Amino acid sequence: MYCCALRSCSVPTGPATTFCSFDKSCRCGVCLPSTCPHEISLLQPICCDTCPPPCCKPDTYVPTCWLLNNCHPTPGLSGINLTTYVQPGCESPCEPRC
């Protein structure tokens, strides 16, 4: 429940990994849905109620962030500096706030 309240994102239960390049930040308002079972593609962020400006920008395209699930292989991103953030699954279900 704590991890859900902290993130407040519409991420399904289970572990998920977000890859971000150093020129973008995937925290505060960038809530990405799972790409599974679809192909990995660039996703549009969703604004969360708990995120103040300027982090929270609805309808803003973030081309440098991907959300991966373990049913997808890691995309070939050679030559790009990446930072990996791992969001653990929640122990108990909670309501999404996005």
Swiss-Prot record:
GO terms for molecular function: structural molecule activity. InterPro entries: Keratin_matx (IPR007659). Keywords: Keratin, Repeat. Residues 3-59 are annotated as: 4 X 5 AA repeats of C-C-X(3). Interacts with hair keratins. In the hair cortex, hair keratin intermediate filaments are embedded in an interfilamentous matrix, consisting of hair keratin-associated proteins (KRTAP), which are essential for the formation of a rigid and resistant hair shaft through their extensive disulfide bond cross-linking with abundant cysteine residues of hair keratins. The matrix proteins include the high-sulfur and high-glycine-tyrosine keratins. This is Keratin-associated protein 3-1.
